[in-house]
């Protein structure tokens, strides 16, 4: 998977010795042939953009009200994710994209070695051209939440065209992330 862009999405992250620039350097070391694109918010000026890297600054759309069962907060950053990922994907022309949060990194490139064709699936229900790899970290248990089709925002790896299908929302209002049963 040489035709790869790593899309780093979100605000600048900093905690003790960890920060987004450190994470980006680790990603560059482990994915040396990948392009780097950062999609963040206006006034996020701590990112160190190197030669051949690209950064786009988005208007921050703010949070939306989050009343779903199991939520510990009253605001969801889903709209922020959609805006930064969608705008980032629109700038990418490589075949594959690894979308990752700005507070995350991979210690190796083993994810690129997964043999996805070994897994069976029913072609009648196929939505994507290839499989998309994502994490279970941050994915909600459907038995304890009222958000349908939730998946982790930590990372997505797949065809850029397939990721565009996932992140194609135009806007999200406060209660559109919730559903209710009668």
Segments the model singles out, each with a brief description of its role:
Residues 17-20, 47-50, 92, 108-113, ...:
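A short acidic (Asp/Glu
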Residues 106-182:
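Catalytic core and acceptor-binding pocket of nucleotide-sugar-dependent glycosyltransferases
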Residues 1-18:
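N-proximal low-complexity "stem/linker" segments adjacent to membrane-targeting elements
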Residues 14-30:
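Short, well-formed alpha-helical segments that are part of the catalytic scaffolds
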Residues 97:
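Short aromatic/hydrophobic "clamp" motif used to bind/position activated sugar donors
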Residues 100-104:
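Short acidic donor-binding/metal-coordinating loop in glycosyltransferase active sites
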Residues 2-4, 28-38, 53:
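Short loop->beta transition adjacent to catalytic acidic/histidine clusters or analogous donor-positioning motifs
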Residues 39-91:
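Active-site-proximal specificity loops/subdomain of glycosyltransferases
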């Amino acid at each position: 998977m040489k035709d790869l862009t790593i899309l780093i999405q979100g605000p600048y992250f900093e905690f003790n010795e960890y920060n987004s620039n450190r994470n980006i350097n680790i990603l560059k070391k482990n994915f040396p042939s990948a392009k780097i694109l950062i999609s963040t918010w206006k006034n996020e000026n701590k990112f160190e953009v190197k030669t051949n890297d690209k950064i786009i600054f988005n208007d921050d759309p703010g949070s939306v009200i989050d009343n779903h069962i199991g939520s510990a907060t009253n605001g969801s950053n889903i709209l922020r994710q959609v805006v930064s990922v969608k705008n980032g994907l629109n700038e990418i022309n490589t075949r594959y994209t690894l979308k990752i949060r700005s507070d995350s990194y991979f210690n190796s490139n083993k994810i690129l070695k997964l043999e996805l064709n070994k897994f069976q699936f029913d072609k009648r229900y196929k939505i994507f051209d290839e499989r998309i790899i994502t994490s279970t970290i941050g994915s909600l248990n459907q038995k304890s939440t009222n958000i349908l089709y939730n998946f982790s925002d930590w990372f997505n790896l797949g065809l850029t065209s397939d990721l565009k299908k996932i992140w194609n929302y135009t806007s999200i209002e406060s209660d559109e992330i919730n559903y209710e049963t009668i």
